[in-house]
Amino acid sequence: MGLGSRSAKQRMHSDFEPHPDAEMCTACNRCVTWCPVDAIVIGPDRVAEVDYELCYGCGECVAACPFGAIAIAWKTEPASIQEKIVEHVAGVLKDKPGKIVYLSFITNVTPDCDCWHFSDAPVVADIGVLASTDIVAIDQAAYDLVTAAKGLAGTKGEGLAEGADKFQEMSGIDGTVAMEYAERKGVGVRTYELKTLA
């Protein structure tokens, strides 16, 4: 996502629309403050209103609302967004084989998207840093390590045992779709060998 232009991010997220609930909205203005494209205003009836021409579906408003008043309305399955992200990644990497080393810092693992300007408490203890020349293998390894970790007490990960898919449990979304699709597209492979350095 980091290398995607604003228009590319909009295309990746185009299947998502936030819908404020008039009954639950308190007009606290938090969603307005957090919207990166100023697509939300508090309307005359004191309810958040979204300009869908400006909104690119980042979801910051959903996470920012302390009252849960903004629902996620997907036009298609979340797997579609994961596949779109992989398509963009494949485009960025196609002319760079063997020229990139990937680092994955498995620290402060958040329950929600880390592209937002805020976060909740980490859901597992810090695990460490991974390095690889294969973007898919490093993602799979990181995913597996988080899955193998125990959820931290007092967080959204509380009660999630070692071996439980933390991301699936917290979001209801299968996070392996992107890695499976990337492997099918030839972006990388999901198999890996972990070598621990002291």
Task: Tell what function each PLM region has.
Residues 1-198:
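Extended, low-polarity segments enriched in aliphatic/aromatic residues
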